[in-house]
From Swiss-Prot:
Tetramer of two alpha and two beta chains. Keywords: Amino-acid biosynthesis, Aromatic amino acid biosynthesis, Lyase, Pyridoxal phosphate, Tryptophan biosynthesis. This is Tryptophan synthase beta chain. It catalyses: (1S,2R)-1-C-(indol-3-yl)glycerol 3-phosphate + L-serine = D-glyceraldehyde 3-phosphate + L-tryptophan + H2O. Its EC number is 4.2.1.20. Pfam families: PALP. One of its GO terms (molecular function) is tryptophan synthase activity. The keyword rRNA-binding does not apply. InterPro entries: Trp_synth_b_CS, Trp_synth_beta, Trp_synth_beta/beta-like, TrpB-like_PALP, TrpB-like_PALP_sf. The modification N6-(pyridoxal phosphate)lysine is found at residue 106. The beta subunit is responsible for the synthesis of L-tryptophan from indole and L-serine. Its cofactor is pyridoxal 5'-phosphate.
Amino acid sequence: MTIAPEPNSFRTGPDERGRFGIFGGRFVAETLMPLILELEAAYETAKKDPAFQAEMESYGTHYIGRPSPLYYAERLTEHLRAKAPAGQGAKVYFKREELNHTGSHKVNNVLGQILLARRMGKPRIIAETGAGQHGVATATLCARFGLKCVVYMGAVDVARQAPNVFRMKMLGAEVVPVESGTKTLKDAMNEALRDWVTNVADTFYCIGTVAGPHPYPAMVRDFQSVIGRETREQMIAQEGRIPDSLVACIGGGSNAMGLFHPFLDDREVEIFGVEAAGHGVQSGLHAASLTGGKPGVLHGNRTYLLMDGDGQIADAHSISAGLDYPGIGPEHAWLHEMGRVTYLSATDSETLEAFKLCSMLEGIIPALEPAHALSKVLELAPQRPAEHLMVMNMSGRGDKDIPQVAEIFGTKI
């Protein structure tokens, strides 16, 4: 990795071509270009429209339940300080995105995109989903606004996320199991893109993460940045200053980008993204694109990808369906190369330990995705002084993972 010269601001990207340095861009079929340009124009107009922002805020407050709390994890903090040298052990806070309607951060972005689809007159919404959280959020808002909803989901994920599949169907969505490839998130995204090309006139593709062709990475980031903006205000209100460090899990990376982006130019704030190391990066069974991948093109953008020796997209593995993706958002790839964000990885076993500990100490059952981030908080917090303020994004709740985790622990539900 080469550290490029530091820019005046880390928050000005992407450029007019949708690039973050050499990452991002628009690598799509010609048939999609008019749609992409139409979407970009609609988003740029909506972004500047006070009525659109007011609508976002109103539904955010009254339907999603924002702002989400910034919660001092007191027992976890005490537990970690007991293991640390005297005077060590950061004060750990959770940004409680799991308390949002539908149970994760995903709804922040979906609300923005569905309001945009309505402005554009698109009555049919398609989405891809891995853990099912983005699918549930999309189905929920389609139900709220009376829009047709089709969700593509890898057949493997359909099996391991049965509660969310049922939720989507209850909300009126059509769930399409994808049997091609590895039958996970990558393949679901491929099928959604095929659908979009086929149904250009009436369909809006609601992408769930900071990936895909421009303007999606920037648009999803902007809709998720409410997380970081609230965190800044809440921490100043509670502690009189901004946090010293931020930690979030990364699949495509939307929850992380939402927390990180408002702090990127606060150079004193340490920022950590946590990828899924699966059975260990050396095992080859992982989803850590930055740790174990290299630059390439997938799903319309250039970013870090897991590839085999022939340059083909490799299979990703994670205990968490939401992190089981062989790429990462292009802005994360750029921040990695710029050295502004430190990217770590957590194994399945480390994640399960954090999952158990959080449940027992804080009475909060985390989703397996943020449990990855929490496993690194357990390592990082004891290395920081007691006055250090560390915020972890609790990006989803663990209800959806209970059947899977119970089975791992030998309990049949």
